[in-house]
Curated annotation (Swiss-Prot):
Protein name: H-2 class I histocompatibility antigen, K-B alpha chain
SUPFAM superfamilies (UniProt xref): Immunoglobulin, MHC antigen-recognition domain
Transmembrane segments: 306-328
Glycosylation sites (chain numbering): 107, 197
Gene that this sequence comes from: H2-K1
PROSITE patterns the UniProt entry points to: IG_LIKE, IG_MHC
Positions of the Ig-like C1-type domain: 206-294
Signal peptide positions on this chain: 1-21
Chain positions covered by the region annotation Connecting peptide: 296-305
Organism: Mus musculus (Mouse)
Region (Alpha-3): 204-295
Family: Belongs to the MHC class I family.
């Protein structure tokens, strides 16, 4: 077991449309935190179906009870909430004892704050059958003990956890837990998926874009954003000329957006002027095909000014050309040139028709009267 991995799992989890077949998961995250001098330990249970929080219990609430966190859970009757509340309160008492027990296992004083965390749940495939079950414990942010994939044996992270392992082996704890994971857990997951299908079975595709950030020494950071997607599983990669940049890429954990969707970004540092050689690739089940993005530089102010100047010059040239053409036409007509329809009026002189007079006539339509 790798130390301190469970804490990262907990942090990542807490943190319309197409439909999808699976897999799906039912998970419970449990946290008990001692706080010497401030009363009893705080105890919390948070339930997730896939990436959606649907129930919560908090011992610090004004009236600690199991509460719905998704609208579709309002279908459950009062007996459900009473039963789950009593179970949570029983678990709360057990974890208070566990916190005191672990102080002895690790030879720790009673003056400090300590934390027990648990992740427990099951995952089913598109056919509704169990793919895997799990139950893992952490103490003060590091792995303590975990049920193995065979659902029959345990792995202890240190000597203190070996004490717990021996006790659970003698009590047949793995057999009891396996029955829950293969039976009760799967049954409730199917029920929740049915009740919340409009929300849980949806797929929201990511909205992606690339931003540009200046750095010293002729470097820039390109950051690829994926926003508003569900479910949370997504992959972002950067490539240079078709080759993935794994070691040079900075990647943040997928984060809840607060509206039931998720967000994530990945960045890479590149030489200034070489941005167009780098591409971001986004993979998500809500996309018909992966997205490929480059940084698109906005039109510069200089470029805009040049464009305006060109348009002004062209416009002036067109107007001038039209005026000149009109003047020449009028001159041909007044001098009896080929194609002229007008004869000179008696006493008129061709030298009296000048360009300035024509300009006035062109720009002042009322002079035609």
């Amino acid at each position: 077991m790798v130390p301190c991995t469970l804490l990262l799992l907990l942090a990542a989890a807490l943190a319309p449309t197409q439909t999808r077949a699976g897999p799906h998961s039912l998970r419970y995250f449990v946290t008990a935190v001692s706080r010497p001098g401030l009363g009893e330990p705080r105890y919390m249970e948070v339930g997730y179906v896939d990436d959606t929080e649907f129930v919560r219990f908090d011992s610090d609430a004004e009236n600690p009870r199991y509460e719905p966190r998704a609208r579709w859970m309002e279908q459950e009757g009062p007996e459900y909430w009473e039963r789950e509340t009593q179970k949570a309160k029983g678990n709360e008492q057990s974890f208070r004892v566990d916190l005191r027990t672990l102080l002895g296992y690790y030879n720790q004083s009673k003056g400090g704050s300590h934390t027990i965390q648990v992740i427990s749940g099951c995952e089913v495939g598109s056919d509704g059958r169990l793919l895997r079950g799990y139950q893992q414990y952490a103490y003060d942010g590091c792995d303590y003990i975990a049920l193995n994939e065979d659902l029959k044996t345990w792995t202890a992270a240190d000597m203190a956890a070996l004490i717990t392992k021996h006790k659970w082996e003698q009590a047949g704890e793995a057999e009891r837990l396996r029955a829950y994971l293969e039976g009760t857990c799967v049954e409730w997951l199917r029920r929740y998926l049915k009740n919340g299908n409009a929300t849980l079975l949806r797929t929201d595709s990511p909205k992606a874009h690339v931003t540009h950030h200046s750095r010293p020494e002729d470097k820039v950071t390109l950051r690829c954003w994926a926003l508003g997607f569900y479910p949370a599983d997504i992959t972002l990669t950067w490539q240079l000329n078709g080759e993935e940049l794994i070691q040079d890429m900075e990647l943040v954990e997928t984060r809840p957006a607060g509206d039931g969707t998720f967000q994530k970004w990945a960045s890479v540092v590149v030489p200034l002027g070489k941005e167009q050689y780098y591409t971001c690739h986004v993979y998500h089940q809500g996309l018909p095909e992966p997205l490929t993005l480059r940084w698109e530089p906005p039109p510069s102010t200089v470029s805009n000014m040049a464009t305006v100047a060109v348009l002004v010059v062209l416009g002036a040239a067109i107007v001038t050309g039209a005026v000149v053409a009109f003047v020449m036409k009028m001159r041909r007509r007044n001098t009896g040139g080929k194609g002229g329809d007008y004869a000179l009026a008696p006493g008129s002189q061709t030298s009296d028709l000048s360009l300035p007079d024509c300009k006035v006539m062109v720009h002042d339509p009322h002079s035609l009267a």
